[in-house]
Amino acid sequence: MAFVRIDTGSEVRTLMQSATISGASSVGTPSSTLNLEIPRDVLTPSASISVSLLEMSGTGSDLARFPRDGGELALDALQNGGIDVVVVPIRYDADGSGRMPDTSEGAMNALRDQLLAMWPVSDVRLRVRESVSTSTTVAPTSGQAWGSLLDGVGNLRQSDRAAGSEYYLGLFAPAASFREFCGRGCIAGIAPLNQGNYQSQRYGLALGYGDEDNRFSAIHELGHAHGRPHAPCGGVSGSEPGYPHAGGATGVWGYDFRNDRLYDPSTKDFMGYCEPQWVSDFAYLRLHQRVVSVAGGSTLSWRLAPHHVFRVAPFTAPSWTGLVEERVTDASDGELTMMKARDRFGRDLGWVGARRVETSLPGFASLLIPDVEDAAFFETPSGQIYRVASSGESALHPNPPDDSNVR
């Protein structure tokens, strides 16, 4: 029998579990081990734990306890505030179908539960926004179309005046089924690779067919929006340089509380393209650090100012997509792209430093350029022009009230 003693600082809780075990124990064989589920309410920052084993027959051993000195181990449990996800249903009008993604209660509960199972959070506050529509045709591998819709989600986040902690996740269904759309390969999602923790870049876009593959895609894109690059598996581009486990493996045992499933350390990290997937210790820690930064309030002290956003894509001129409120950067943020601001007559308004935010799709990025009064365009030292438009052309449009999909 196993006894687990947990001292929360205000109470002592004892948990017990018994089993008959013969032979050596192995982590990957649950029947060979004793397993207890610890209630979340006792995992406080001040909690400490001790474990002892008692042989039901026989004399037992004084060494069958942890810590062996008879003391307690401080858990150093951390609270990080959880995450806020706003799902944006996008009605697909390009083929005349008016097709909606699956944002049913069951699908959203499954997405929330999978985030809770994989990410270092104890709370996922997920809501479904009113739907919008698009007439943009999205082919399975059309990076330009995906980039256009992604910009629309980002602009929507800005026009909604979303809370700083909210991550917008656009979902859409460009074909009748995932198999029909992706049978010969496809882009399944795209998001800014938000390594700079820019408030305006907390959004992403994914297919919304409601199955487990699509949930993994959505969570993968939320990972990018939290600053996570690709794990090195499956021919990804721009993989994490310091990823510690060969082949993009998780490197540690994983556990899914929803079904008591264990994931072998050879399982692949969810930020790669290989299967099966779970979350690595490496990604888990870094996601926690980002969630703490966002939800813990460290971003509240940022000084915000208007920034122009330009979409950069292969084989096309930079396009202005709108204005966002973003933090004022300085040299400590890393490399800046210096640009000359000019008015509509070409007169010099001074230098500004722009930030480039890559997306998960190679070659596609956003450029954040601080606004300058009367600026009509910005010019790089090499002569490339970034022209400000009076208004951006969005790929997303509001739906009539009866098409809304709110929960």
Give residue spans per PLM region:
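Short beta-strand elements
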Residues: S57-A94, Y386-R407
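Short, aromatic- and glycine-rich surface loops/edge beta-strands on solvent-exposed regions
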Residues: A2-V4, T44-F66, M339, D371-A395, ...
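Solvent-exposed serine/threonine-rich low-complexity stretches and specific carbohydrate-binding patches
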Residues: T8-G28, E130-S133, R347-P362
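Preference for solvent-exposed, low-hydrophobicity sequence contexts
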Residues: T337-G363, E379-N405
